[in-house]
Amino acid sequence: SMGRGLVRDDVSAILFDEPLTVIDPHLKWKLRRKLKQIHEQFNLTMVYVTHDQLEASTFADKIAVMYGGQIVQFGTPRELFESPNHTFVGFFIGSPDMNLIEVDRADGGVSFDGIHLPLSDTLTRFLSDHPSDNIKVGIRPEFVHVWDEASEEALQCDVTACEDLGT
């Protein structure tokens, strides 16, 4: 389909449906880079369907994340990573996935397991405008820091597991 799309004048978009699924990792990396070069050279819209979030994040200018047959968020890879607006997006984008903690409303914030987590004025207003009791806080593991001493700006907790990622 890509060849026909490149030689015809009446094509404005090319659809790729899992094009790199059964290709070995090294060749996949080379082909992904080549597709990106072709995209930039010909300035065609490419719709790239994949279940591989790394592939989507490195290839795409914008990503549409689907869940249950519906698009639940559309944005840049950075927007999806930093500000997921659906729990599936938080789970799907990033590795390891986002930790989701069910919380309860509390004055000026939320609470869980006896811990009060203050929220910004913007988030507090957002919660007051949305009466749902289904509230979750998402924490990306790479943004967690371990400190030797207690701090008012940190949450005290017990580390129960640590995964060595080799870095």
Question: What is the role of each PLM region?
Answer:
Residues 42-44, 49-50, 76, 92-94, ...:
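Short, surface-exposed, polar/charged, turn-prone segments marking secondary-structure boundaries
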Residues 98-100, 107-167:
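Non-catalytic connector elements of ABC transporters
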Residues 17, 24, 51, 77, ...:
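Generic secondary-structure boundary/loop-capping signal
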